[in-house]
Amino acid sequence: MKILIASSHGYKVRETKVFLKKLGEFDIFSLVDYPSYHPPKETGETPEENAIQKGLFAAQTFRCWTIADDSMLIIPALGGLPGKLSASFAGEQANDKDHRKKLLENMRLLENTIDRSAYFECCVALISPFGKIFKAHASCEGTIAFEERGSSGFGYDPLFVKHDYKQTYAELPEAIKNQVSHRAKALVKLQPYVETVLANHLLAGKESL
C-alpha cells in the first residue's frame, strides 16, 4: 500500500517511517522526494486544522493515503505563545535557532515569575485522496529551560524539558524521544486507523484476484 508522509522535515519523516514499518508493508514516500512541491500556507488556529489542511492538499495532489501532522508549543506565562506561531515565531524566513532565541528573549522578560511550564499539542491525521479523515491528538507537558541543552532533535527540542525525564527533547536519545514525544503518542493513537486502512486495502486486493 502506498502512503505519503506529508513532510519534508527529515526528523519527522524518519520518526513516521519507523512507526509505519512496525505496522505492515507500506510503499512509503515523503515530500523529501518531491523538492519542487509547494505545500499550502498554514492558516489554522489549531494543530488539527493545520494537519488536515496539509494532509488533504497532499493526498489530493498525489492521489494516495497521506499522514500529516502539526504541533504547537504553548507557554501559559506568555499568554499561550508561541502557539499557532510556533513555526514562524521569529518570522516566516527564520530558522529553528532564530525561533528558540526569540523564545528565550521573551522568557527573560519574565525572570520574576517561577512559572516556566509549557506543553506541546499535536494532531496527526490520516487522510485519503477522497477526503476521508482519521485523526488523533496528544500532548506533552514540561518546562522551558534557561538555555539550550542537547544537540539532537529540531525546533524547540533543546529548550523543552519533558516531565519525568529532567532532560530536554534534544538531550534524549532519539529512540527514547520517538516513544515519549507528543508526536509519538499521537501516532500510537492513530495506529488502529492505519491498521484498518491497510487491512481493507489488502482485502480489496485479494478480492480483485
Curated annotation (Swiss-Prot):
GO terms for molecular function: dITP diphosphatase activity; ITP diphosphatase activity; metal ion binding; nucleoside triphosphate diphosphatase activity; nucleotide binding; ribonucleoside triphosphate phosphatase activity; XTP diphosphatase activity. It comes from Chlamydia trachomatis serovar D (strain ATCC VR-885 / DSM 19411 / UW-3/Cx). Its cofactor is Mg(2+). Belongs to the HAM1 NTPase family. Pyrophosphatase that catalyzes the hydrolysis of nucleoside triphosphates to their monophosphate derivatives, with a high preference for the non-canonical purine nucleotides XTP (xanthosine triphosphate), dITP (deoxyinosine triphosphate) and ITP. Seems to function as a house-cleaning enzyme that removes non-canonical purine nucleotides from the nucleotide pool, thus preventing their incorporation into DNA/RNA and avoiding chromosomal lesions. GO terms for biological process: nucleoside triphosphate catabolic process; nucleotide metabolic process; purine nucleoside triphosphate catabolic process. It is an enzyme of class 3 (hydrolase). This is dITP/XTP pyrophosphatase. The keyword Hydrolase applies.
